[in-house]
Amino acid sequence: MKGLEKIIPLDGRDIKVVLQKFAPQAAGSILISSGETAVLVTANRAAAREGIDFLPLVVDYEERLYAAGRIPGGFLRREGRPPEKAILIGRLIDRPLRPLFPQWLRDDLQVVATTVSLDENAPPDVLAVTGASIAVLLAQIPFNGPMAAVRVGLVGDEFVINPTYKEIERGGLDLVVAGSPDGVVMVEAGANELPEADMIEAIDFAYEVIRDLIQAQRDLLKELGIDIVRAEPPAIDPTLENFIYDRAAEPVKAILKRFEKDKNVRDAALDEVQGAIAQEIAALPEDDPVAVAAAENPKALPTLFKAVTKKLMRQQIIEEGVRVDGRRLDEVRPIWCEVGVLPERVHGSALFNRGLTQVMSVTTLGSPADAQALDDLHPEDSKRYLHHYNFPPYSVGEVKPLRSPGRREIGHGALAERALEPVLPPKEEFPYVIRVVSEVLSSDGSTSMGSVCGSTLSLMDAGVPIRKPVSGAAMGLIKEGNEVRILTDIQGIEDFLGDMDFKVAGTDSGITALQMDMKITGLPVAVIQQAIEQARPARLHILEKMLAVLDKPRPQLPPSAPRLLTLQIPPDMIGLVIGPGGKTVRGISEQYNVKVDISEEGLVTITAPNETNAKQARAAIEGLTRKLNAGDVYLGRVTRIIPIGAFVELLPGKEGMIHISQLAEYRVGKVEDEVKIGDEIVVKIREVDSKGRINLTRLGIHPDEAEAARSNSVV
């Protein structure tokens, strides 16, 4: 099967799509590639299940190690559960797709993207996003597309489209933008304190290219004779709709105008109104048109009641400029923070509160051996900074079974990690592995940005010398026709009933992370610009509150933190320090109660429970790698005896010979009369000859030299 191939020009990094060749039973399938990176994307649709009241969309992203010419490790030698990076790419595909499906659609939808080939010049994620749009269109699923995504990086002072991994790493910007014909649908960015104006310019630059990719998809569909499927929402019985609106409008409006600060009180009041309407419907005769409509659609009441609440909340914001808790549109909720909230056994801790959102962040410092090993398709082989986010059910007052972290928790942790990574000290200056855990103790919106703020304080409480503190705010949007209102520091109900969740994190100098998700089909860049600009004073206000509690990292690490010392050894001496079968390094570790990690470049990191042990272990390794010179004094161990003298191990793997005449001031008849195998004796190097042979003596050693040798012995 030959299939249909098309090339989409893209700034020198063309995209090739192959249709009608792979996965012929899938409703829509495409192989999309750039360079040697190729992603197979499929889309399928199944009939709606009974009782579903949401859009059942599942997006899966999978990586096959054969894509990079590798065989998986482990006993089974096959891929297991998706690595974290694959989960994040799955979310990256899902987030711009989801708002473009009709929200009333109840058919089961599944999009599967599989990276089948990978090179270092073309990351697969943005290809998968664009490929998902094409696959959905080919599957003839109702969709407000086309949609496409590009990545923007910085090379010098120039923005580039779809940069290589190396260009991303060097440039200080990793921005992914997805867009539809209506505007930008999704933004995901990590940056090295990029000024707001530059970030806005980069988003605008990306969307101009996205327009071309959208047009290319339209041209492709036209050539295939395929129309984009649009569909009208199912009709709602006006009798039931009017009944609910007439009874809900005034009570809901009154509740929203109470300006209640506590969401639980507000939610309880709204539930009471909905419950009263439900009771009134239940009391109607069975043949009443309202009762009949409610019986035919049991989920109509909660759906329509939500619609009334949404309409009135949005109306209040647009017409009166006031929010349900009484705040102005650009006002941040009350903030209070505290550091050192846990006992000193914990390395660093902080509690961050904003309104009813509360996050506790805890920092732990570890050795290089604690770094997370990565076994996926991406260039990084390990991570020294880990940020984990937990969202237990009690944070929203619910009772649910505890499960392993889901996609949302992994995504929020990755966002906080991305926000803080640019301000962390380089490992050459601070060799610790850093783990921060953000525990959401109470949630009323913007918990991910609460994690960023709490984690900044926690890191400083642990004595991590971050370059600058980072704060974050979540921005929202209400859009009705041409009326647009940007909301600062959104709470739960504004996120739930609003049109946008736009998280902005950064320092006082610029942005370190962005994440924008939409519930509408797109926004002009001008509106995004307004949101980014409105976020800055909010971030600085939050930062001021944080710094009032702790304005800089503590000068000392906590007593409970391990002590790390580093030293550089020549790479050709790594084997000497490790020893045969690891004997030497294991001996040092056991003797001084330390962990020793050695990089391929010869950087030795010693992790110890206290500074004394660390220094002793460092002295031992320095002794191992020290060049032996005439006049040096060592405490050595006798390893062999021959008639004319004895061999003495000075350092692991380094022996010298002491002649029988150099064993004592007096004449020695037999070597065994003076020393035995296993004896520890103090010796001085007489000479190192041209062949590297070491000649020793026990004569002429000052008592102070002997004592120093005993103190620094490594044999």
Swiss-Prot record:
Its EC number is 2.7.7.8. Keywords: Cytoplasm, Magnesium, Metal-binding, Nucleotidyltransferase, RNA-binding, Transferase. GO terms for biological process: mRNA catabolic process; RNA processing. It catalyses: RNA(n+1) + phosphate = RNA(n) + a ribonucleoside 5'-diphosphate. The keyword Mitochondrion does not apply. Its main location: cytoplasm. It is found in: Cytoplasm. Transmembrane segments: none annotated. SUPFAM superfamilies: Eukaryotic type KH-domain (KH-domain type I) (SSF54791), Nucleic acid-binding proteins (SSF50249), Polynucleotide phosphorylase/guanosine pentaphosphate synthase (PNPase/GPSI), domain 3 (SSF46915), Ribonuclease PH domain 2-like (SSF55666), Ribosomal protein S5 domain 2-like (SSF54211). Gene3D superfamilies: GHMP Kinase, N-terminal domain, K Homology domain, type 1, Nucleic acid-binding proteins. Residues 562-621 form the KH domain. GO terms for cellular component: cytosol. Residues 631-699 form the S1 motif domain. Involved in mRNA degradation. Catalyzes the phosphorolysis of single-stranded polyribonucleotides processively in the 3'- to 5'-direction. This is Polyribonucleotide nucleotidyltransferase.
